[in-house]
Amino acid sequence: MSENNILCIKWGNKYDDSYVEKLKEQCEANCSVDFNFWCFTDNPTHDYDIELPTYLDKHYQEDRGFFWAWRKCYMFDDHVDGDKFLFLDLDVIIHQDVKYFFELPMNKPWIVRGWWNDDETVKRNYSKHKSTPLNSSVIRWDRGQMTSVLQHVKDNAEVIFFTYPSLDNYFAHHWYNPWEDEGDLQGFPKGDIYSWYKGNIYPEDMEINKLRPDHKICLFNNSTYTEGNSDEEIKKLW
């Protein structure tokens, strides 16, 4: 077994198995170091599947719809061997060798810093729990580095699920300071990760619906899209 682990999560009906298989294919084609591929899922059927825990699920309030994607917290527990972990959302396009992420200096975990955000808007909307500067579509951590995050969610689940519209918003309020651009999480550098729907770097490179193969990864994050509406658009670009 390799010390390097690439993780994804699939639950419900938003994504079918083709997304997991495509992500696995992309990783195999774009990673020059050995790695183990794992998918946390509520419907395990493959050798690489790990059954999702459910102990946080009881805190989710469907009528509020808050704190979606909380299931990502489950992967911060010790479910697999190895010391290096890279999480990828299912709807990403990998342009370059993800070996890069396993070789980053690991004084603290890495997460997507949405450089497409206007920092003044981020600060203005901070108390409204909107316009988060962080995005959890790609996270890189070493064993034990996200344990405190999982424990904080466990210890304060009722309040956290009630308060925060998203996991990203929770990260930005508890583990990152947008005024200082620092915290217990650090953002991937400019030029690493961009958004198909939101652009790249504010304000100089904000063209949307544009592939940037000189970057590592393209995200398909877009809160304005109805769930599933962007599926065919993503598949055309695979």
Predicted regions and their residues:
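Short, hydrophobic beta-strand segments that form beta-sheet elements in well-ordered domains
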Residues: 32-42, 86-88, 109-112, 181, ...
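A short, glycine-/small-residue-rich helix N-cap motif at loop->alpha-helix starts
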Residues: 58-71
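Catalytic core and acceptor-binding pocket of nucleotide-sugar-dependent glycosyltransferases
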Residues: 136-238
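GT-A fold catalytic core of metal-dependent nucleotide-sugar glycosyltransferases
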Residues: 45, 68-119
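Short beta-strand-to-loop element that shapes/binds the nucleotide-sugar donor at the catalytic cleft/hinge
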Residues: 110-140
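Short, solvent-exposed loop/turn segments at secondary-structure junctions
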Residues: 11-14, 43-46, 54-58, 92-94, ...
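Short, P/G- and charge-enriched loop/turn segments at secondary-structure junctions
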Residues: 62-64, 122-129, 205-206
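N-terminal anchoring/stem segment of glycosyltransferases
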Residues: 1-61, 80-81, 222-229
